[in-house]
Amino acid sequence: MSRFFIDRPIFAWVLAIIAMLAGALSLTKMPISQYPNIAAPAVSIQVVYPGASAKTVQDTVVQVIEQQLNGLDGFRYMAAESASDGSMNIIVTFEQGTNPDIAQVQVQNKLQLATPRLPEEVQRQGLRVVKYQMNFFMVVGLVDKTGKMTNFDLGNLIASQLQDPISRINGVGDFLLFGSPYAMRIWLDPGKLNSYQLTPGDVAQAIREQNVQVSSGQLGGLPTRSGVQLNATVVGKTRMTTPAEFEEILVKVKADGSQVRVKDLGRVVLASENFAISAKYRGQDSAGLGLRLASGGNLLETVKAVKAELEKQKAYLPEGVEVIYPYDTSPVVEASIDSVVHTILEAVVLVFLVMFLFLQSLRATIIPTLAVPVVLLAAFALLPYFGISINVLTMYAMVLAIGLLVDDAIVVVENVERLMHDEGLSPLEATRKSMGQISGALVGIGMVLSAVFVPMAFFGGSAGIIYKQFAVTIVICMSLSVLVALIFTPALCATILKAPENDAHHEKKGFFGWFNRSFDRNSARFERGVGGILKHRGRYLLIFALITAGTGYLFTQIPKAFLPSEDQGLMMTEVRMPLNASAERTEVVLQEVKDYLLKEEGQLVDHVMTVNGFNFAGRGQNSGLVLVVLKDWAARQAAGEDVLSVAERANARFARIKDATVMAFVPPAVLEMGNAMGFDLYLQDNLGLGHESLMAARNQFLELAAENPSLRAVRPNGKDDEPQFQVKIDDEKARALQVSIASINDTMSAAWGSMYVNDFIDLGRVKRVYIQGVDSSRIAPEDFDKWYVRNALGEMVPFSAFATGEWIHGSPKLERYGGISAVNILGEPAPGFSTGDAMIAIAQIMQQLPSGIGLSYNGLSYEEIRTGDQAPMLYALTVLIVFLCLAALYESWSVPMSVILVVPLGIFGAVLATLWRGLEADVYFQVGLMTTVGLSAKNAILIIEFAKELYEKEGVPLVKAAIEAARLRLRPIIMTSLAFTFGVLPMARATGAGAGSQHSIATGVVGGMITATVLAVFFVPLFYVVVVKVFERNKKPAALAEEELA
């Protein structure tokens, strides 16, 4: 094949140009994201039961739904939480590869079976089923620069005008409103109700009867008799729109004809539906809409669509109201992609310089450089067919591929140059002879490197998604690289290279002359060194065994993790106030946190948004959240200016805040996989020990974790039990007084909860009508005595006649995991420890907890456990596949063994470099390790291919063949290894977005290449000689027999 294109160079150019054009066209159409869909698909079921406690919601809603969630395809696990505000959320997580749309449909079908068993009030509220991601990908908000609108006004504006169009955008999965829409609020006075002998149920019934939309039909509607001349729509009663209309609702007509209307029983106002959450942006009242990405959504495209929609809506906002973006993850994505693009450009330049240093000819250097755009662009034409998008993982793979793909071209060019210099051949003749010598080696290298990565593409879970991005991209690049080296590069060599004049290679002056003389001297020393090693094989085999054993030991010392930490320019701070603390107290702490961040860290922090009434541990007046966005990475280059350092200083300062627990934390590397980096686990009550026992086990766990040096910031992702006032109804007394239990329940729901009645129309939108007691009637336990229920005789009976109350302790938030009562705990490894170390410590702590308390990991931690279990299989399978490919290629068992023996030498350097930089054995390290395995094997193949040729075909004695092959291939091995190492070096020294993952990949690769090159060139001849002697002792070829006689 190579000869065909050597004789037809224009044909080769045409193919290269077509490949580049196809890639450029594909590049403009490929989606761009920071990561592929690494997070497992999940579906969320959301329900509200107004006025219900967390326990009530768990018993009457959560468990009913859980019992129906069986038989779902690809089901992995489910987690549920219920809160004291009546809200409930069940998150069902599926295996990677499950279609999120089908998963959502299946969950909805199962939910239909559970719906008839749910409380009527829950059914009336409706159930939401949405595709779900854990973290917000952005928060959009509104502020009023005039100061006229409160956060509740702004919340209504978002709910009325922005929420629907934004939530319909493709890619938006779920949302959380930091604010609330308006509702028609009817505040009932219990004294007035009692004086008119009415109950909240009477008011609700009157509203339902009079606030209705009546479908009245038509005049002259068909069928009718002939001669009818009129057809008109009959308009009946419509829903009310203003507080004044609701005030006039007739509740009761007395015997004397006097009327009791709603306005006689309390106040009617247009007010917020929910007062629990309020927000501030840079100290101003604001409201926000937190958006979660839909499973499978494209983050950049979704952010672009959201901002475009908001630009359209700006024209319809009141004067002075501005759109803000207090939290946006898209700059992280863009910065990560830009960083890798710069890395690729740096890699190309460095590779070019290394090649020029060795080839010392601009013509010879340009040839392998031209291979880079051809292969990379052609790869983009093929990637979409494998479901691969443009993301940081494919770009990292491209960086690795640059060093790999120029290797093949360098091997061709260097061998052609050698033949021209050593044998005086013309470029055309040298190219033809060269391709006859090295075509097998090129195919072998391509097969080996492909074999290294192919097994990675078939692993499951989130790690499998990461492996696949690298595997597919590198295998495509390697395959194209081999084709370019067999088609395009020979054509360029035959037409671009010039024959040397008077052995010019050895007569160069200046720097290149010095370099060549130095390299030749060192080559001679190297040749003598290889000869010495082959004379003392036993000694050096022992050294190799020690290196291998040391590598195994050092490997066990690397801390384990799933993904490295990243500076994404984002930080969150949770505020947890004491039990039963008011929203006013929480606001004071939120302001203190905000002031510290904007004043003490003002040079690094761009802006903050505070949210009162909500954090990831739950909702409530004692909860708060601060969203922090740091300045651009270019403005934070100095030591101590990264987000982890900012969070560390912030936590040291927040520890001094009295009467509050304030914790700053950083999002995980993959934002869709959690809210905070570290570990995420559930303690489960496997034996049904009860809530008190579970909480006691949780507290014991937290105490033991606080004493463990490898753990820090271990905290419950929930709420402690708090004082609750329990009302006990004496059914016997109630029946004796002829009071209906249903009337009692209705009165309690309306008085202290918030009873949803029906809907009204506000500015053309449907909103809700609620009745509730005035604030003075629901402040203290004594206020229960203010409420009355009407019995069957029409008499008003006070609550105190049939009800008593007492203070108890109960949880404002209950959790379940896998259908079992559980508590969620988050934490981080202490400085100097990894998440793998933390998990070992957790396992030790679990042994001290009571029997019946189980442990399950969630989110990123679940993936880390799963990845750790897969890693040994990945290593073993990779080595096995490489061995089998080489055996098939060379029709020999000895050659593959010689190649495989070199692998520990590369791993040795990778492990040393990773330990030296204090990095962890994460998924990226494993990718780097597999790359090192392939490159180590490649160097071995280059030597063994020549030694095999000399020994088996030319009859050169075995030892001489090994020494000669090592001498001949030393220069290309050093050149290709340096080219690859310098190509990866920009990743090893990267800063800014995505630097953690780049360091993790490149550090191991650079360290592995150094040892794989420095040690392998000495040990590969030894391995080849020893293996041939062992495997072919009985064959006794002529050269081997001659050598033994000598």
From Swiss-Prot:
InterPro entries: AcrB_DN_DC_subdom, Acrflvin-R, MdtF-like. It comes from the Bacteria. GO terms for molecular function: efflux transmembrane transporter activity; xenobiotic transmembrane transporter activity. The keyword Cell inner membrane applies. The keyword Transmembrane helix applies. Keywords: Cell inner membrane, Cell membrane, Membrane, Transmembrane, Transmembrane helix, Transport. The chain crosses the membrane at residues 10-30, 339-359, 370-390, 392-412, 440-460, 470-490, 542-562, 871-891, 895-915, 927-947, 973-993, 1008-1028. Its main location: membrane. The inner membrane transporter component of an inducible organic solvent efflux pump. Involved in export of toluene and styrene but not of m-xylene, propylbenzene or ethylbenzene. Is not involved in antibiotic or AMP efflux. NCBIfam families: 2A0602 (TIGR00915), RND_permease_1 (NF000282). This is Toluene efflux pump membrane transporter TtgE.
